[in-house]
Curated annotation (Swiss-Prot):
Free-text tissue specificity from the UniProt record: At the start of neurulation (stage 13), expressed in the pronephros. At tailbud stage (stage 25-28), expression is high in the anterior-most branchial arch and pronephric glomus. At stage 40, staining persists in the glomus and in the epicardium region of the heart, and at stage 42, expression is higher in the glomus than in the kidney tubule or duct. In adults, expression is highest in the rectum and the spleen, with significant expression in the duodenum, heart, kidney, lungs, pancreas, skin, liver and muscle.
Record field: compositional bias (Basic residues): 50-64
GO biological process, one term: reproductive structure development
Localization per Swiss-Prot or TrEMBL: Nucleus
Purpose of the protein: Involved in epithelial-mesenchymal interactions in kidney and lung morphogenesis that include epithelial differentiation and branching morphogenesis.
Name of the coding gene: tcf21
UniProt biased composition (Polar residues): 34-46, 70-80
Sorted UniProt keywords: Differentiation, DNA-binding, Nucleus, Transcription, Transcription regulation
Broad class of where this protein is predominantly found: nucleus
Annotated bHLH domain residues: 79-131
Name of this chain's protein: Transcription factor 21
């Protein structure tokens, strides 16, 4: 849109002809006006963009002719956008497969059941909590401490230091004997 500044007048004087798909058009001819929006361009008869006049009848400031660098830059952006879209689709495929595998490993979910990702995570979390509870009930059986009951650096979770020394000296960690 014209701002009425001096640079607009200079742009009018510099612009003798407009180009639409390689065809030179006289800027004095009437062009189609876009009623939808305040876009700088409307379309030629063949559907390609061309410069037009605004609703006030004044010419709008024409953008500079496309240079080869501008075209290359736009093509580069399109290539980057396509690559980013492909990466996102691949990421979503991997995520979807992971949720599918997780759903099939849950023992009480029938295979034909449709679950949202949130429901799958909730069921998996409750299943893990159930398994932890089973292990917690058996944690001192046979003198072993299961790794699920250990915290970094391999201390029995929730035990005071005095009790811990007794448990470690009388129990064996999973794997080789701890000393």
């Amino acid at each position: 849109m014209s701002t009425g500044s001096l640079s607009d007048v200079e742009d009018f004087q510099d612009m003798e002809m407009l180009e639409c798909d390689g065809i030179k058009l006289d800027p004095n001819k009437e062009f189609g006006i876009s009623n939808d929006s305040n876009e700088e361009s409307s379309t030629c008869d063949n559907g390609s963009p061309k410069k037009g006049r605004g609703t006030s009848g004044k010419r709008r400031k024409a953008s500079s002719k496309k240079s080869p660098l501008g075209t290359i830059n736009q093509e580069g952006k399109q290539v980057q956008r396509n690559a980013a879209n492909a990466r996102e689709r691949a990421r979503m495929r991997v995520l979807s497969k992971a949720f599918s595998r997780l759903k099939t490993t849950l023992p009480w979910v029938p295979p034909d059941t449709k679950l949202s990702k949130l429901d799958t995570l909730r069921l998996a979390s409750s299943y893990i909590a159930h398994l932890r509870q089973i292990l917690a009930n058996d944690k001192y059986e046979n003198g072993y401490i299961h790794p699920v009951n250990l915290t970094w650096p391999f201390m029995v979770a929730g035990k005071p230091e005095n009790d811990l020394k007794e448990v470690v000296s009388t129990s064996r960690l999973c794997g080789p004997t701890a000393s």
